[in-house]
């Protein structure tokens, strides 16, 4: 195998490790809690069971979940597909070169 083909094969094998979910996961920005301007404090008249007023509190129960039909996609799907095509072309070229070399050797042996 040529160096290029070996490199492509190695990239194909190592590229399968990285997995990225299809849907982006929302990121939540937490504000510093030791700052008095950003930390809301409940009033004394509010009941302890009242919903918190923090901006991220309403979103905390909405954790991203995978649906049964969702699919995990490799982040390198397209490049890996291209590398597979290039690897097949390199193998075909190497086979043609080997066949040409064999034909030259057989032609020399036949003429001796």
Swiss-Prot record:
UniProt keyword terms in alphabetical order: Glycoprotein, Hormone, Secreted, Signal
Predominant localisation class: secreted
Localization annotation: Secreted
Biased segments, Low complexity type: 38-58
Short name of one Pfam family: CRF
Propeptide boundaries: 23-70
Gene Ontology molecular functions: corticotropin-releasing hormone receptor 2 binding; corticotropin-releasing hormone receptor binding; hormone activity; hormone binding
One Gene Ontology term, aspect cellular component: extracellular region
InterPro entries with a match to the protein in the record: CRF, Urocortin_II/III
Cleaved signal peptide residues: 1-22
Residue ranges, annotated region (Disordered): 27-66
Tree of life domain: Eukaryota
Post-translational modification: Glycosylated.
Cell inner membrane in keyword set: no
Any one Gene Ontology BP term: hormone-mediated signaling pathway
Disulfide links within the chain: none
Family: Belongs to the sauvagine/corticotropin-releasing factor/urotensin I family.
Subunit and interaction comment: Binds with high affinity to CRF receptors 2-alpha and 2-beta.
Function: Suppresses food intake, delays gastric emptying and decreases heat-induced edema. Might represent an endogenous ligand for maintaining homeostasis after stress.
Name assigned to this protein: Urocortin-2
Native source species: Homo sapiens
């Amino acid at each position: 195998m040529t160096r290029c083909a070996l490199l492509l094969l190695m990239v194909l094998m190592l590229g399968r490790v990285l997995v990225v979910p299809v849907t982006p996961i929302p990121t939540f920005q937490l504000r510093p809690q030791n700052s008095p301007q950003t930390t809301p404090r409940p009033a004394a008249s509010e009941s302890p069971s009242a919903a918190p007023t923090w901006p991220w509190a309403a979103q905390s129960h909405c954790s991203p979940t995978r649906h049964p039909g969702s699919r995990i996609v490799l982040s390198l799907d397209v490049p890996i597909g291209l590398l597979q095509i290039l690897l097949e072309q390199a193998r075909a070229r190497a086979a043609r070169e080997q066949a040409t070399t064999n034909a030259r050797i057989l032609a020399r042996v036949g003429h001796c």
